[in-house]
């Protein structure tokens, strides 16, 4: 519902990485027992949801969904711009999708499928899949190292180091298109 104060880490706890590219956060799931252990760990630490990162193994995802159901906790997806995976997560019972599916336009069949579930979408348009992220807009149009509000939190040299000088033409910015698509979903009750 958007009423959680503070960083997401306090609502989802440690993410569940089932791929080995984050070796220190790797949490393999080969059974419902494994999934129950990981979900219970997060719940014991106060999480109200678990976040499944880029889990390409559908059986493992289904174990996480079942464990989440059994333990009364939400399960949120980080899908790395894989619309097909998003659709299987939707069908399998995920309760949340962060970012977007990286897909636009979204046609009526997918809108109806989304609308028939209890899935919530947090678009996070600063990170947009399959196009330049929303962050690039600010790096291109603003001199962030001169922003007085940002300078309250960061030193000027840090802001200069973080800038990413790139150029995108206005019609290259995918964030606005994705925002329009997300608004259509919102208007339809998704």
Task: Outline where the language-model segments fall.
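Alpha-helical scaffold segments that flank or form the walls of functional sites
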Residues: 1-5, 27-48
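Active-site neighborhoods of metal-dependent hydrolases
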Residues: 38-56, 102-190
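Alpha-helix-loop-beta-strand connector modules within alpha/beta enzyme cores
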Residues: 2-15, 61-80, 118-123
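Active-site mouth loops of central-metabolism enzymes
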Residues: 19-36, 76, 81, 168-171
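Active-site environment of divalent metal-dependent phosphoester hydrolases
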Residues: 1, 17-18, 55-60, 80-87, ...
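N-terminal small/glycine-rich loop or linker at the start of catalytic domains
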Residues: 7-24, 62, 152-163
């Amino acid at each position: 519902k958007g009423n959680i104060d503070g960083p997401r880490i306090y609502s989802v706890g440690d993410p569940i990485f089932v791929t080995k590219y984050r070796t220190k956060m790797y949490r393999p799931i080969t059974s419902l027992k494994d999934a129950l252990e990981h979900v219970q760990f997060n719940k014991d630490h106060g999480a109200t949801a678990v976040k499944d990162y880029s889990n390409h193994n559908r059986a493992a995802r289904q174990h996480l969904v079942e464990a989440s159901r059994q333990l009364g906790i939400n399960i949120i997806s980080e899908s790395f711009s894989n619309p097909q995976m998003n659709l299987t997560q939707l069908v399998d019972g995920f309760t949340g999708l962060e970012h977007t599916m990286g897909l636009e336009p979204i046609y009526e069949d997918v809108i109806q499928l989304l609308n028939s579930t209890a899935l919530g979408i947090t678009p996070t348009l600063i990170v947009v899949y399959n196009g330049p992220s929303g962050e690039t807009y600010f790096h291109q149009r603003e001199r962030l190292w001169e922003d007085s509000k940002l300078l309250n939190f960061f030193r000027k040299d840090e802001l200069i180091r973080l800038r990413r000088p790139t150029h995108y033409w206005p019609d290259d910015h995918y964030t606005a298109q994705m925002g329009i698509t997300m608004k259509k979903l919102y208007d339809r009750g998704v």
